[in-house]
């Protein structure tokens, strides 16, 4: 009888040990993912994007020794109301640390998917450059609303703040060492600072609080080949989609 009890106690102890180790590994990977993103997100807000001319980033053997690198920043909002096309608006900017110049494009898109048909992509690009932290069209823009949107555009990196990133709890963690790829997803509230900032700047047609997804590929410690992006998903289903995505990373310059 005593032997059976001892075996039972031993079995339960081993079970708790396995559970603890598994949970510990999960928490460890979550902390790694957060730290990986914190390297970039701790710079937010970058109110003046010209500060990036003097900002170092992760470098590996993909960089030429004389190349300071180019920061690539991209922010976009996508909204699909029921029965309508997915409407996307955003801007991509390449900030060259070698030439201390920045150029890119503002873009709009409407993606329509009819029954039994392939999605129709209607992307339009409007070339821009940045001077004195302001965005200027480099080609004539006939649409007055697009002109204003370009002039008033702000990247997420300019107004967001992730000082509480390490305090986010109960994340849904995914890690695939084969790719490698990794992600951490958190349910936010409408009281979250960054959620308030997005609602202040965009007409978001839902009161649902979003989920925040931190997603990346490549080495967790850093990679110029992989990517990192963050996504706020307010709605995601067959008929409606509302999400905001943002990314900022240093890449080898194209002319080096």
Curated annotation (Swiss-Prot):
Coiled-coil spans in chain: none
Range of residues in the leader sequence: 1-24
Membrane-protein topology: Lipid-anchor
S-diacylglycerol cysteine lipid modification positions: 25
Lineage: superkingdom: Bacteria
Compartment(s) where it occurs, according to its Swiss-Prot or TrEMBL record: Cell membrane
Protein name: Uncharacterized lipoprotein SAS0073
């Amino acid at each position: 009888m005593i032997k059976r009890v001892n075996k039972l106690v031993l079995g339960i102890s081993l079970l708790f040990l396995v559970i603890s180790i598994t949970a510990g590994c999960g928490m460890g990977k979550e902390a790694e993912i957060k730290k990986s993103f914190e390297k970039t997100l701790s710079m937010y807000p970058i109110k003046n994007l010209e500060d990036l001319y003097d900002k170092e980033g992760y470098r590996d053997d993909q960089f030429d020794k004389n190349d300071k690198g180019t920061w690539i920043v991209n922010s976009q909002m996508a909204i699909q109301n029921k029965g309508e096309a997915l409407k996307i608006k955003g801007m991509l900017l390449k900030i060259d640390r070698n030439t201390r110049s920045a150029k890119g494009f503002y873009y709009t898109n409407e993606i329509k998917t009819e029954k039994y048909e392939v999605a129709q992509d209607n992307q339009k690009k409007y070339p821009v450059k940045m001077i004195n932290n302001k965005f200027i069209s480099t080609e004539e823009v006939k649409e007055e609303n697009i002109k204003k949107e370009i002039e008033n555009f702000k990247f997420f990196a300019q107004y967001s703040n992730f000082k509480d990133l390490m305090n986010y709890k109960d994340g849904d963690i995914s890690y695939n060492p084969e790719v490698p790829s990794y992600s951490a997803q958190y349910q936010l509230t409408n009281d979250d600072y960054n959620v308030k900032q997005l609602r202040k700047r965009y007409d978001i047609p839902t009161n649902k609080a979003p989920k925040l997804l931190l997603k990346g590929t490549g080495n967790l410690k850093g990679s110029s080949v992989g990517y990192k992006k963050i996504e706020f998903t307010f709605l995601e289903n067959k008929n409606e989609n509302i999400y905001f995505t943002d990314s900022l990373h240093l890449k080898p310059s194209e002319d080096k």
